[in-house]
Amino acid sequence: MPKKVFCGVVTKAKCDKTVKVSVLRVYKDKLYKKVIKRYKEYTVHDENNSCKEGDKVFIQEHRPISATKKWVIVRVE
């Protein structure tokens, strides 16, 4: 099974080797046909401490690194 890859923006980068990434999900409501935007924050492992707040990053599923970190950074733009 392929691993999920999401694109998001770094919202917090204060901890060592850990960042918070906000991912936007856009979908259309089936009943009311309204476009809805939802954001979800993921705790992501940043091995090299290469991210700053506001960076656009791609994250990928990974084995659990800690109790909350199950994602790693693939690419920083």
Swiss-Prot record:
Domain of life: Bacteria
Pfam families to which the protein is assigned, alphabetical: Ribosomal_S17
Gene Ontology BP annotations: translation
Cellular component terms (Gene Ontology): cytosolic small ribosomal subunit
Originating organism: Wolbachia sp. subsp. Brugia malayi (strain TRS)
CDD domains to which the protein is assigned, alphabetical: Ribosomal_uS17 (cd00364)
Assembly information from the UniProt record: Part of the 30S ribosomal subunit.
The protein, known as: Small ribosomal subunit protein uS17
The protein's role, per its UniProt record: One of the primary rRNA binding proteins, it binds specifically to the 5'-end of 16S ribosomal RNA.
Record family assignment: Belongs to the universal ribosomal protein uS17 family.
Keywords carried by this UniProt record: Ribonucleoprotein, Ribosomal protein, RNA-binding, rRNA-binding
Keyword RNA-binding belongs to the record: yes
InterPro entries, per database record: NA-bd_OB-fold (IPR012340), Ribosomal_uS17 (IPR000266), Ribosomal_uS17_bact/chlr (IPR019984), Ribosomal_uS17_CS (IPR019979)
PANTHER family per record: 40S RIBOSOMAL PROTEIN S11 FAMILY MEMBER (PTHR10744), SMALL RIBOSOMAL SUBUNIT PROTEIN US17M (PTHR10744:SF1)
One term of GO molecular function: rRNA binding
